[in-house]
């Protein structure tokens, strides 16, 4: 095996571990050793942490997905990024779906996504992100109140079709294992609505609420901005 092949293998494992983490609770992979995530001790390996490639990496997550404000389990509560903290239950978010390793086709069979979304994304893995502070399940998931440009991510009832289902678009993943996360309620399949970290949120120092924005490709159809590329990890901060 060549040295270049040896370097590629850990990256490939990292990509596979990332998508597995987001679609089903899993243990720490050999793809990125020495890293853990931001679930509370009560949630431990049952929870996931989504992080932005703009602000962190698999070696240092820094900021992770969380319920903002007072962390109350209420419809419309904003969802964004907080500094990773194992004692913060607002960072306890569980992956959920009709089946382990659910695909968009599985969500379609459950009546949770449209036929159009299934036609375009049916083979891709998908997930709901259920809010579970201290490992206590709520009936609220990360979603959108409406599907439009710059709509903030908020808690929505998990039984709402489309807007609470997220497609893990690994066909656009980077070699380092970061990928876009597309909302299944999108109707523009060339530039679908995806998780986005607004630059003004980072610059202002305010809570980092995530938004839905059309995918913004750079020089070619396969290059995305770091603000629309995400990683995921399972477990508890040491």
Label every model-predicted segment.
Residues 39-149, 167-209, 219-238:
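Extracellular glycan-recognition/adhesion modules and their associated mucin-like linkers
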Residues 79, 152-157, 213-215:
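Aromatic-rich beta-strand patches that line glycan-recognition/binding surfaces
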Residues 33, 159, 223-226:
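Intrinsically disordered, low-complexity regions enriched in Ser/Pro/Gly/Gln/His and often acidic
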């Amino acid at each position: 095996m060549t040295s270049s092949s040896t370097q590629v293998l850990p990256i490939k494992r990292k990509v596979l571990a990332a998508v597995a983490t987001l679609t089903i609770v899993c243990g720490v992979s050999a793809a990125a050793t020495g890293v853990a995530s931001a679930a509370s001790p009560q949630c431990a390996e049952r929870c996931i942490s989504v992080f932005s490639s703009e602000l962190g990496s698999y070696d240092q997550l820094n900021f992770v997905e969380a319920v903002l404000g007072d962390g109350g389990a209420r419809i419309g509560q904003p969802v964004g990024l907080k500094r990773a903290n194992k004692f913060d239950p607002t960072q306890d978010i569980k992956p959920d779906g009709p089946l382990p390793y659910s695909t968009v086709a599985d969500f379609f069979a459950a009546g949770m996504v449209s036929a159009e979304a299934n036609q375009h994304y049916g083979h891709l893995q998908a997930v709901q992100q259920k809010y579970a502070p201290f490992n206590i399940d709520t009936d609220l998931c990360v979603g959108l109140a409406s599907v439009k440009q710059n709509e903030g991510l908020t808690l929505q009832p998990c039984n709402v079709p489309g807007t609470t289902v997220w497609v893990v678009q690994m066909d656009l993943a980077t070699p380092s294992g970061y990928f876009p996360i597309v909302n299944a309620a999108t109707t523009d399949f060339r530039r679908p609505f995806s998780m986005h970290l607004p630059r003004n949120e980072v610059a202002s120092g305010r809570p980092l609420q995530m938004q839905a924005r059309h995918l913004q490709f750079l020089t070619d159809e396969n290059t995305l901005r770091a603000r629309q590329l995400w990683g995921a990890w399972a477990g508890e901060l040491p």
